Amino acid sequence: MKRSIYAVISLIMMVMAVGFTACGDDDNKGFSAEQIAYFEKNLEFIREKKVLKGDDGELLYKQIVLGGDTALYRVLGKEGEETQCPTSQTPVTMILKGDFISDQNFQKEMTMTLTPAGVVPGLGAILLNNTIGERVEAIIPANLGYGYYDYRGIPAGSTLIFTYTIEKFN
């Protein structure tokens, strides 16, 4: 009887120790105050664009929800009558450039061929809705881009703005 009481008390102590450790306030995952401010600035940019309305009172950006986050896009112009959209494996030839919300460029404008499955998830989901001849502005939040780790010159938590024209599906 005495042993079982000690066992129960030991078990309760272990559960409490694990519980207190799990409830720590270190939710910043080691990010600096400067990084957290950058993340928040990028999130605020997305929040503002989500509710932006055009002259007609309609939302300016279409929204694609993917994995609990939202990528935004709008068609800036269209040439031709093509209505077919690519599949996830369709090679898409486009002229593309990439910018941060500060207008600093991270991808110079150039022609490239990519598949929707071969790019960051947010851009891939938007490409599945595009047709040949469309000029598109896509806004990709960090969760649907490169995430919260630095990646080849792209700072952690960056919102990505891609502007591209679909030339052809190969």
Language model regions located:
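Cross-family detector of peptidyl-prolyl cis-trans isomerase
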Residues: 2-6, 19, 23-170
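Bacterial N-terminal signal peptides
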Residues: 9-19
